[in-house]
Amino acid sequence: MEGSPAGPIEQKEARWESSWEEQPDWTLGCLSPESQFRIPGLPGCILSFQLKVCFLPVMWLFILLSLALISDAMVMDEKVKRSFVLDTASAICNYNAHYKNHPKYWCRGYFRDYCNIIAFSPNSTNHVALRDTGNQLIVTMSCLTKEDTGWYWCGIQRDFARDDMDFTELIVTDDKGTLANDFWSGKDLSGNKTRSCKAPKVVRKADRSRTSILIICILITGLGIISVISHLTKRRRSQRNRRVGNTLKPFSRVLTPKEMAPTEQM
C-alpha cells in the first residue's frame, strides 16, 4: 500500500539493493551469482586484486634483473687458439651493446677471480692492442713467445654485479706448419700483413748475458782441465826422475884405494 511504512523485509531488501548499486564495476567478476544477491561487499576479493596489481610489476622487474645478471654479456669467439713464435694472435670478444660504455679489459690466469689484468680498453701496450667497436672487443697480441702460452680472459666491469668474463686458451708453438687455422697466418683482422716482429731488447740482453755466462763457464772449465793435465804431467816427470836417481846411486859411489887394490891384482 502506498504510504504504508515498510516492514523489516522490505527495508532489508532496500539496503541490499543500495549496497549493490554502490559496488564498483570491477568487483562484479569477483562475486559469484549467489553472493551477488546475498553479500553486499567482499573486502577480501578487493584486497587480493590489489595485491595482484602490485605484484605483477615487481615480478617483471625481478625477472628482468635476473636476466641481466645471469645472461652472458661477454662471449669469446673461440675457446682454444693456436699460434707460433714471433707471430700475432687475435681474439674477438662479443658483448651486448648495453655495455658499450663499460670498461673492458684483457687478463691472464687460469682462475677468473685471480687473473692478472694486462690492459684496459682503449689503452694498449707494446705486446697487446685493444680495440672496442661498440659490440666487440678485439684483442691482438704480437711478438708471441712460448711463454705466452696460457689462459686469457675478456672482461666487462659492472658496477652492481659481478664482472662478466669469458676465456680462451692460447697455445704457442715453434712449428708454423702445425697450424691448421688460417686465422693465425700472420695477418690481422683487417687483412693487412703484420709487421715483422723482432725480438725485444730485453730478450736480446738476456740472450747476451746467457752467451757471456756460457763463454765464461767454458773458459773456466778449459783452464781447470789444463791445470789438471799440467799437474799430472809434472807428477809423472817427478816420479820418473826419482826412479832414474835410485838406479844411478850405487854406481856413483867413489872407490877407496883399498877397494881398488884387489881389483888391480885381479
UniProtKB/Swiss-Prot annotation:
Signal peptide: none annotated. GO terms for biological process: activation of adenylate cyclase activity; immune response-activating signaling pathway; inflammatory response; negative regulation of cell migration; negative regulation of cell population proliferation; negative regulation of NF-kappaB transcription factor activity; regulation of heart contraction; response to wounding. One of its GO terms (cellular component) is membrane. The keyword Protein transport does not apply. GO terms for molecular function: transmembrane signaling receptor activity. It is a multi-pass membrane protein. Its main location: membrane. The chain crosses the membrane at residues 55-75, 213-233. Glycans are attached at residue 192. It is found in: Membrane. Residues 1-20 are annotated as: Disordered. Keywords: Glycoprotein, Membrane, Transmembrane, Transmembrane helix. Expressed in the lung and bone. Expressed at lower levels in osteosarcoma tissues (at protein level). InterPro entries: CD300_family_receptors (IPR050671), Ig-like_dom_sf (IPR036179), Ig-like_fold (IPR013783). PANTHER family: POLYMERIC-IMMUNOGLOBULIN RECEPTOR (PTHR11860), TRANSMEMBRANE DOMAIN-CONTAINING PROTEIN TMIGD3 (PTHR11860:SF4). This is Transmembrane domain-containing protein TMIGD3.
